[in-house]
Each structure stands twice: as C-alpha cells, then as structure tokens.
C-alpha cells in the first residue's frame, strides 16, 4: 500500500488517540487513490473553474508602491467564491468524503471563512455539516455565522478554554473520534495530524501554480519574493509549494505580531514558540514555562492560532523560507492603504502580508524588485472590527 511521508524533517506526525488511526489511514489511502484517478481530478478542476471561479486574477497594484522601484502584484484569492482561498481545498476534501462514503462533515473555524467554505461545499454536494467555532469568534464574526446557517450548517459555539480557534479544533477532534464511521473531519488548514498537512497543501497548490504561469506571462521572469500571511499556514503553503524548488525566489511568511512581538499578545509560534505536541502534530507551539499551550492573539481571528503547519516549521528550520511578523497596527494601516489606493478591501489576515510587502518596498525605495502577495481573502468580514478600532482611535 502506497504511503505518504508523515513528517517534514522532524515536524508533523500523527499524535492522535488510537481510535482515530483507522480513520486517518482510510483518508490517506482515499487521497492517494483519488490523486491517481483522472475522474476525481476532472471533477475537482471542474468545480474549481465553474463553481469557485478559478483561475483567480494576478493584479498589478497601480498606486501602493508609488515613489519606489518595487512592482507589487496581488494574487486575488479574495475573488474566489466564498471570499477566500479556503474554498479550494474544501471542495477537494468534500469530494474525498463522498468518495469514502461519508455523508456528514465536521469542521472547525476561526474567522468563519473555513466554516463558510465548508458550508457552501456541503450545500452543493448534499452533505450534512456541523461547524465548531470559539464563542468569542462567534461574536466577532457574526456575518459569517449567519452565512453558514443560511447554507444549512449547524454552528456549535465552544465556550471552553480561550473560546477561540484552538478550542474549536479540540472539540471538532473530540466529535470525530465518536463519529468517524459516518463523518469526515474537514480540517481547515495545513496543520494537524498526518495526512492533513499534505492533503491541504496539495488541494491549495494551484495558487502557486497559477501565480507562476501568470507572472511569467506578464513579466517574463519569476518574482524575487512571494509573500503570504501564516496562521496555520494553508494559503502560504499553497503559494509556496510550486516555488520551493525555484531557489531564486524568496518565500516569506508573515506571522501576526499582535500588540508587539515582545508582549505576550501575539501569534508567532515559528519565531517565538517551542516545539511541542498539539492538535495531533509535532510543531512549534506557543507555550508557557510549564509547557501549557499559551493563548495566541491577533486582531485577525484567522491568524489567532498558537501553532503552525509542520511544513512551514521545516522550511523555516532548513532556511528555505523566512518568517517575519507584522503588528495589528501595521496590518490595519495596510488594510486602509490598499482600500484607499487600490479599491480593494482585503481580509485583516491578508493585510499582514501586504504590510510586509510595503515595508520591503519602502525600506529600500531604489531597489528594483518584483513581489507577489497572496491576497488570501476579502475583508467584508472585518469591516465592523476595523470600524470599531478606528472609531476608538478617533480616526473616523
């Protein structure tokens, strides 16, 4: 029986209760078989094109980098049906679930984007859907909660722990261990127990594949750097995957520095965590001195995650990708700038990557460089959050 590699260097693995091992093995085999089945590939590609709207545009910014010699392109995952890159891999996993004969889907969500994507795929493909969401996130993402319910999903608020994404993840896994015979756990990021990090990456890698073709057609060369925000890391690994072998291209992941990387209110486990076991995998993790999982913090619910996918941990360890961070304030500034000067309202998550690209352009305005930011989602879900912050600052 063919097997996928469970580890990226020392990171990854499958740290789950024994009861879940058969479900994960079944999933791995179904994925391997599906990848070799032209009918599965064809159905997946048809859904991506005719339902989700792929390929997404690669947009050259006209005004953001004025006064510098940087050319900045945006990979427009915000234009995808559902409003973010999440839809790509959700369609793939939902098709896999049907292939395995599962008729129920369990998911977790932070910002609500993965929940919405899961709900739309389940509505389309006739699957039952329940979504676990931290009670705090239910409050700060009410439009997405209503969207999920409109599409027939049951949204289950989680009040335990910090009532955010990590707690929703734990509850979803708990549910799955009782229901795996009928239900598929549709994990939302390139993290968690093997084979999820590999499956999610492969169902997101069209982001980088399209970007490579589009930039070569437009510029006749590869970019100097591709930049993406990193929470769990699926939009970033989707962008990076096709460039890993292209050594001339810098891969830059941007973690949330929250209220400051030297405070205890950030979400940057890659740079400021210690290796531990969390959510079924071995990965960098924000921990207190006693080894307990520390609360992560970010203004954007989708980056508010105390760990990171194992492939990012490996790319960081071997020096192939570099990981920096951006504060809430810098992300909010970039959010306003791109809205004001390009007519695009990005997700707060994606604004972290935009902020980093602008920092690169402005730190060295005379440097000629070609940058691509993965604009992973649109910002409709964030306008109330941003409005409240700007109002408090007296900025509006």
Curated annotation (Swiss-Prot):
Instruction: Show the catalytic activity.
Output: (1S,2R)-1-C-(indol-3-yl)glycerol 3-phosphate + L-serine = D-glyceraldehyde 3-phosphate + L-tryptophan + H2O
Any one GO MF term held by the record is: tryptophan synthase activity
GO CC field: cytoplasm
Which branch of life, at top level? Bacteria
Is Ribonucleoprotein found in the keyword set? no
Query: Which pathway does it take part in?
Result: Amino-acid biosynthesis; L-tryptophan biosynthesis; L-tryptophan from chorismate: step 5/5
Q: Which E.C. number(s) belong to this protein? A: 4.2.1.20
EC category name: lyase
List, separated by semicolons, the cofactors it needs.
pyridoxal 5'-phosphate
Keywords, A to Z, come to:
Amino-acid biosynthesis, Aromatic amino acid biosynthesis, Lyase, Pyridoxal phosphate, Tryptophan biosynthesis
Which residues are reported to carry the modification N6-(pyridoxal phosphate)lysine?
Answer: 86
What function does this protein fulfil?
Answer: The beta subunit is responsible for the synthesis of L-tryptophan from indole and L-serine.
| PANTHER family named in the record | TRYPTOPHAN SYNTHASE, TRYPTOPHAN SYNTHASE-RELATED
Describe the protein's quaternary organization and the partners it interacts with: Tetramer of two alpha and two beta chains.
- Into which family does the record put it? Belongs to the TrpB family.
Protein name, per record: Tryptophan synthase beta chain
> Taxonomic lineage per UniProt?
Bacteria, Pseudomonadati, Pseudomonadota, Gammaproteobacteria, Vibrionales
């Amino acid at each position: 029986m063919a097997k996928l590699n469970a580890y990226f260097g020392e990171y990854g693995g499958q740290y789950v209760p024994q009861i879940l091992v058969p479900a994960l093995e079944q999933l791995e085999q179904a994925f391997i078989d599906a990848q070799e089945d032209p009918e599965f590939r064809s159905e997946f590609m048809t859904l991506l094109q005719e339902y989700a709207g792929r390929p997404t545009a690669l947009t050259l910014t006209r005004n953001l980098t004025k006064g510098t010699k940087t050319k900045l392109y945006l990979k427009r995952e915000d234009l995808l049906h559902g409003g973010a890159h999440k839809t790509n891999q959700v369609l793939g996993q939902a098709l896999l679930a049907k292939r395995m004969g599962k008729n129920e889907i369990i998911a977790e969500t932070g910002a609500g984007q993965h929940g919405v994507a899961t709900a739309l795929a389940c509505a389309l493909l006739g699957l039952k859907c329940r979504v676990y969401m931290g009670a705090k996130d239910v409050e700060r993402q009410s439009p997405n909660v209503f969207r999920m319910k409109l599409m027939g999903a049951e949204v289950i608020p989680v009040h335990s722990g910090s009532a955010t994404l990590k707690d929703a993840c734990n509850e979803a896994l708990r549910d799955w261990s009782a229901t795996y015979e009928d239900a598929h756990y549709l994990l939302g990021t390139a993290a968690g127990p093997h084979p999820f990090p590999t499956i999610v990456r492969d169902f997101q890698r069209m982001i980088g594949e399209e970007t490579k073709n589009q930039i070569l057609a437009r510029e006749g060369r590869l970019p100097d750097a591709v930049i993406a925000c990193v929470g769990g890391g699926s939009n970033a690994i989707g962008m990076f995957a096709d460039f890993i072998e292209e050594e001339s291209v810098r891969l830059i992941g941007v973690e949330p520095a929250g209220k400051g990387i030297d405070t205890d209110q950030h979400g940057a486990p890659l740079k400021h965590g210690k290796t531990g076991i969390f959510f079924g995998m071995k990965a960098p993790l924000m921990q207190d001195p006693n080894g307990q999982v520390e609360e992560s913090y970010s203004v954007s619910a989708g980056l508010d995650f105390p760990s990171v996918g194992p492939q990012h941990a490996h790319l960081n360890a071997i020096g192939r990708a570099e990981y920096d961070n951006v504060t809430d304030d810098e992300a909010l500034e970039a959010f306003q700038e791109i809205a004001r000067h390009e007519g695009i309202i990005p997700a707060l998550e994606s604004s972290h990557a935009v902020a980093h690209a602008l920092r690169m352009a402005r730190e060295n305005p005379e440097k000629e460089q070609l940058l691509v930011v993965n604009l992973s989602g649109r910002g409709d879900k964030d306008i109330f959050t941003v409005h409240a912050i700007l109002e408090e600052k007296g900025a509006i």
